[in-house]
Amino acid sequence: MFAKLEDIERSFMDLEQELADPEVYNNQERYRKVTMAHAELGDVVAAFREYKQLSADLEDNKEMAKDSDPEIREMAEMEIAEIKDRLPKLEEELKLLLLPKDPMDGKNIILEIRAGTGGEEAALFAADLFRMYSRFAESNGWKVEVMNSNPTGTGGFKEIIAAISGSRIYSMMKYESGTHRVQRVPATETQGRIHTSAATVAIMPEAEEVDVQVRNEDLRIDVFRASGPGGQSVNTTDSAIRITHLPTGLVVICQDEKSQHKNKAKAMKVLCSRLLQAEQDKQHAEMAEQRRAQVGSGDRSERIRTYNFPQGRVTDHRINLTLYKLDAVIEGDMQELVESLISHYQSEALKQQAQDG
């Protein structure tokens, strides 16, 4: 681990030198990339430097603890105790900082909540979940924008979709995907019986706008004379353009303009629009598949968490965590729940890393 940390520190110092280089500073794209790389390594380098400093201080204090002056010895022993308490914690921090980063962690999210088993009660629960997430977002300074909703007449939602934007949202919210189960007595229940309902939650990183990269070698451009009704030639010059995108087989023809250059520009614009749409369709298909994998069918048995109102508890079944503060959680006080999930999955990743060597 420490050899890897030494390599990271060297890379960090190289990046610092690059940032001080006027040539890099004057190249906006290069400067942006170097700044991002430098910032990404900042936390781990700071922790490693603290670890090295504390290790050196420990050795110094061990020497001071041999001093003939009892006051110096006492002071050194106090320092040694503090350092020995801090070093193991710092080592654990470093292990976490060395875990591979999820490239999606910094992204905004799309939140989708759908009522599952349980009819109107499930729709009301979906509304409760949306309010819970909205208030949690508000407490973190995030922005929530409803994209689409299918409300019921009693204040529930068959479905609600929202975009949530802010800082590192996906890293905190990604473990919310799955089936959430509620156990409570519905307002319409006259016998006081507890009903079980469910809603599914999908958390997806918000897709960036797709940049269309069209390489010249991927295009075949043919020029020909524009034709009018009945195939007659309406132009004596080869101004019409046919562009074929070889990797996809998409073909665009433009012959409205008398200028070949204008026809080519129009055809390229149409081609790029079609390629962009095709890429977005592909992303949507992948997102739909991801959603299916995440949330299951909405059946009560496929649960990640249970909200039991009569007992005032919320239980996350993945990490066997039960909190007896359901009222606070459902009002958006989710920090303990979220941090426990992050900590659990970080521990799992550390175990996996140790097994992989």
UniProtKB/Swiss-Prot annotation:
Q: Which residues carry this modification: N5-methylglutamine?
A: Q232
> Which GO terms of the molecular function aspect are on file?
translation release factor activity, codon specific
Q: Does the keyword Cytoplasm apply?
A: yes
Q: Which Gene3D superfamilies match?
A: 3.30.160.20, 3.30.70.1660, 6.10.140.1950
- Subcellular location, principal: cytoplasm
**Coiled-coil portions:** none
Going by the UniProt record, its keywords in alphabetical order are: Cytoplasm, Methylation, Protein biosynthesis
Annotated function: Peptide chain release factor 1 directs the termination of translation in response to the peptide chain termination codons UAG and UAA.
* Family listed: Belongs to the prokaryotic/mitochondrial release factor family.
NCBIfam families listed in its UniProt record: prfA, PRK00591.1
Read off the HAMAP family from this record: Rel_fac_1
The protein's name: Peptide chain release factor 1
What is the species of this protein?
Maridesulfovibrio salexigens (strain ATCC 14822 / DSM 2638 / NCIMB 8403 / VKM B-1763)
User: What lineage does UniProt assign to this protein's organism?
Assistant: Bacteria, Pseudomonadati, Thermodesulfobacteriota, Desulfovibrionia, Desulfovibrionales
